[in-house]
């Protein structure tokens, strides 16, 4: 196995995952979203209302990127932005009803993706993969 191709392999896997996610979203009638919106929506599925700052930290993106992504989600009707009662310079983000309706779709797609990723890989190997990828991430 060529160890010097690790970055290319990781990039290829990411591309395949993104393609799978877009295809599955389209099959479920969800259009206009990019895979980068998934991390934001997933965080909001697990946290009712968050500040833009906390959302940026949670998805490990800078605030300007998150602002653009949230703007698209607002335009699509999936989230809304509210002024913070604690800090007038800060905004809160929460799912709309339309955004909440995405939750089961995202969970189903996520479960099917994980099943596909781990197909033919036993639990010991899965743990090894996760451990090694974490080490690679920490090295960078």
What are these regions (language model features)?
Residues 20-65:
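N-terminal helix-turn-helix DNA-binding core of bacterial DNA-binding proteins
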Residues 1-31, 95:
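N-terminal leader segment of winged-helix/HTH proteins
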Residues 2, 6, 36-37, 98, ...:
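N-terminal positioning helix adjacent to the helix-turn-helix/winged-helix DNA-binding module
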Residues 12, 16, 45-46, 58, ...:
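Alpha-helical structural segments
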Residues 1, 124-140:
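C-terminal regulatory/oligomerization modules of transcriptional regulators
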């Amino acid at each position: 196995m060529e160890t010097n191709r690790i970055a290319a392999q990781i990039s290829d896997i990411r591309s395949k995952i993104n393609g799978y996610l877009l295809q599955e979203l389209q099959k479920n009638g969800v259009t206009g979203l990019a895979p980068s919106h998934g991390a934001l929506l997933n965080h909001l599925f697990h946290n009712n209302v968050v500040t833009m700052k906390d959302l940026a930290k949670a998805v490990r993106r800078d605030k300007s990127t998150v602002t653009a992504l949230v703007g698209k989600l607002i335009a699509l009707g999936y989230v809304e932005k509210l002024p913070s009662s604690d800090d007038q310079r800060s905004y809160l983000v929460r799912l709309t009803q339309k955004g909440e309706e995405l939750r089961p779709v995202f969970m189903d797609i996520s479960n099917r993706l994980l099943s596909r990723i781990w197909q033919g890989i036993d639990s010991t190997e899965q743990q090894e993969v996760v451990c090694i990828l974490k080490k690679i991430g920490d090295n960078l």
